[in-house]
């Protein structure tokens, strides 16, 4: 017997909050799934909620059972695991989960579908998929052994029995393949080849997106017969990045090679324009300047405000200083084989030229060999955007 929700009132409270956040009622099929799957059964005794200041507040069910249950049925993300002081697993915000499921078309499937979830975590998302598609149609994959065990225990306690696999979500798993839907619960900066290989023609690949510059957005791809996939980004969700089992397969770290040559110049591009919270601009920079990351230094040791830019794939770096007086020119220092600030400036200029496109005007084509080509739709044309300066945008009808 499937376990009921804590109370009907708790489920209604969560549904009301989700509807309010999404600004529209969720489709009936998704509403039934949310009412059916008891979120509290998928949470550990100790959960952490963001405190709005970069930290986390602990809620322990043993000490505060009523508050813990209230948190379980609040439309918010909850950290469920820390590793070396950093959050490494969470229960996603329910409204984001339902928005993703709606994007995948699961609110009104026209035929039976098979789905692979990449990242079981608590098991809550897998349970929603089971409620929508049936247990036998769902495969869920988890790399972390402890999370896999916990997710399996949670799913069984709630009465759901999808196919559970312990392993790397970036490699091929044949159970139920090819899939009509591949749904990731973590963010990626490239589409693993196995996801395209395991997608049925016309199948959907839905994944949160990240770049070294901007961890934001959800990519919805459609797979094609020739092994390629194409789709558009959507302006919601910021998820933890994919974890890999071997360091050699992880995201490359900056090289240690010293590049003493330091080029200094003056720039009219404000660092706040590309790293000050404009998600449309930051998304474009992140998508088209691969490997570039940033951090702010406001200690005053070098300048009142300094933007530090680094290349996560090599030794290049740059700094942009605000002297506290002039907001129309900034001192730039660059070193390494890439002139990072020049690349970022070119990307920002292109974004301006294209009419400051929103996140949802951006898209991605992944060809059968795995090449990733980002593009922007603006002024009725599709523009293939280039990462390096000095290369003009190519337009396609």
Describe the predicted segments one by one:
Residues 183, 188-304, 383-397:
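Class I SAM-binding transferase module
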Residues 88-206, 211-213:
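Conserved nucleotide-cofactor-binding alpha/beta core module
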Residues 306, 311:
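C-terminal catalytic lobe of FAD-dependent flavoproteins
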Residues 25, 30-31, 85-97, 210, ...:
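Hydrophobic alpha-helical segments that drive targeting, anchoring, or assembly
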Residues 312-397:
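C-terminal target-recognition/interaction regions appended to catalytic cores
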Residues 59, 231-237, 315-324:
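Short amphipathic beta-strand/extended segments with alternating polar/hydrophobic composition
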């Amino acid at each position: 017997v499937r376990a009921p929700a804590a109370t009907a009132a708790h489920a209604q409270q969560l549904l009301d909050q989700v509807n309010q956040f999404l600004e529209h009622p969720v489709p009936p099929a998704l509403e039934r799934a949310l009412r059916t799957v008891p979120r509290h059964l998928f949470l550990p005794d100790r959960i952490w909620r963001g405190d709005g200041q970069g930290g986390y507040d602990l809620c322990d069910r043993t000490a505060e059972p009523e508050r813990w249950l209230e948190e379980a049925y609040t439309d918010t993300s909850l950290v469920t695991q820390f590793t070396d002081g950093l959050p490494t697993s969470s229960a996603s915000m329910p409204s984001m989960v339902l928005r993703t499921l709606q994007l995948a078309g699961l609110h009104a499937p026209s035929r039976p579908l098979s789905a692979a979830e990449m990242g079981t975590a608590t098991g809550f998302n897998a349970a929603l998929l089971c409620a929508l598609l049936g247990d036998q149609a769902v495969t869920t994959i988890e790399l972390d052994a402890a999370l896999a065990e916990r997710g399996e225990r949670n799913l069984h306690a709630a009465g759901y029995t999808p196919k559970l696999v312990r392993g790397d979500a970036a490699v091929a798993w044949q159970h139920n393949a090819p899939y009509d839907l591949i749904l990731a619960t973590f963010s990626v900066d490239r589409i693993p080849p196995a996801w395209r290989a395991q997608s049925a023609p016309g199948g959907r690949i839905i994944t949160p997106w990240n770049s070294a510059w901007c961890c934001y957005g959800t990519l919805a791809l459609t797979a094609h017969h020739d092994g390629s996939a194409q789709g558009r980004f959507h302006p919601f969700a910021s998820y933890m990045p994919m974890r890999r089992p071997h360091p050699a397969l992880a995201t490359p770290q900056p090289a240690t090679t010293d590049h003493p040559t330091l080029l200094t110049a003056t720039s009219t591009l404000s660092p706040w324009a590309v790293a000050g919270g404009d998600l449309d601009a930051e998304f474009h920079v992140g998508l088209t300047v691969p490997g570039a990351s940033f951090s702010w230094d406001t200690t005053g040791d070098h300048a009142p405000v300094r933007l530090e830019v680094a290349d996560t794939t090599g030794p290049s770096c740059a700094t942009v200083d605000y002297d506290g007086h002039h907001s129309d020119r900034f001192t730039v220092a660059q070193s390494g084989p890439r002139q990072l600030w020049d690349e970022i400036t070119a990307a920002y200029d292109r974004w301006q030229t294209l009419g400051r496109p929103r996140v949802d005007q951006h898209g991605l084509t992944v060809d059968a060999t795995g090449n990733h080509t980002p593009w922007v739709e603006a002024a009725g044309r599709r523009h293939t955007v280039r990462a390096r300066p000095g290369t003009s945008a190519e337009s396609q009808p």
